[in-house]
């Protein structure tokens, strides 16, 4: 049977993969956003695993809120990237740093 440890290991692997994605590919903003979403998914897996292990629904409810906020964050981030690409013609991180007030 799959226990709590297995879910925590999967969550840790996903979280480390997200961190690795951010550190390896600092040039592409879309990959950075996807890595952040992967890290949030890993945290949600841990919330659900602990919630199931303890028999409490609070972790699962909190996971739904985190998923909602993550979806809104991804939609707003991609909308900003589309506008930035239309204005600048690129979405490189170096070009994002030159934006001023």
Curated annotation (Swiss-Prot):
The keyword Hydrolase does not apply. The chain crosses the membrane at residues 4-24, 30-50, 65-85. Its EC number is 7.1.1.-. GO terms for cellular component: NADH dehydrogenase complex; plasma membrane. It catalyses: a quinone + NADH + 5 H(+)(in) = a quinol + NAD(+) + 4 H(+)(out). Keywords: Cell inner membrane, Cell membrane, Membrane, NAD, Quinone, Translocase, Transmembrane, Transmembrane helix, Transport, Ubiquinone. Coiled coil: none annotated. It is found in: Cell inner membrane. GO terms for biological process: ATP synthesis coupled electron transport. The keyword Iron does not apply. It holds the Pfam family Oxidored_q2. It is a multi-pass membrane protein. GO terms for molecular function: NADH:ubiquinone reductase (non-electrogenic) activity; quinone binding. NDH-1 shuttles electrons from NADH, via FMN and iron-sulfur (Fe-S) centers, to quinones in the respiratory chain. The immediate electron acceptor for the enzyme in this species is believed to be ubiquinone. Couples the redox reaction to proton translocation (for every two electrons transferred, four hydrogen ions are translocated across the cytoplasmic membrane), and thus conserves the redox energy in a proton gradient. NDH-1 is composed of at least 14 different subunits, Nqo1 to Nqo14. The complex has a L-shaped structure, with the hydrophobic arm (subunits Nqo7, Nqo8, Nqo10 to Nqo14) embedded in the inner membrane and the hydrophilic peripheral arm (subunits Nqo1 to Nqo6, Nqo9) protruding into the bacterial cytoplasm. The hydrophilic domain contains all the redox centers. NADH-quinone oxidoreductase forms a supercomplex with ubiquinol-cytochrome c reductase complex (complex III or cytochrome b-c1 complex) and cytochrome c oxidase (complex IV), which stabilizes the NADH-quinone oxidoreductase complex. Belongs to the complex I subunit 4L family. PANTHER family: NADH DEHYDROGENASE SUBUNIT 4L-RELATED (PTHR11434:SF21), NADH-UBIQUINONE OXIDOREDUCTASE SUBUNIT ND4L (PTHR11434). This is NADH-quinone oxidoreductase subunit K. It comes from Paracoccus denitrificans (strain Pd 1222). The gene is nuoK.
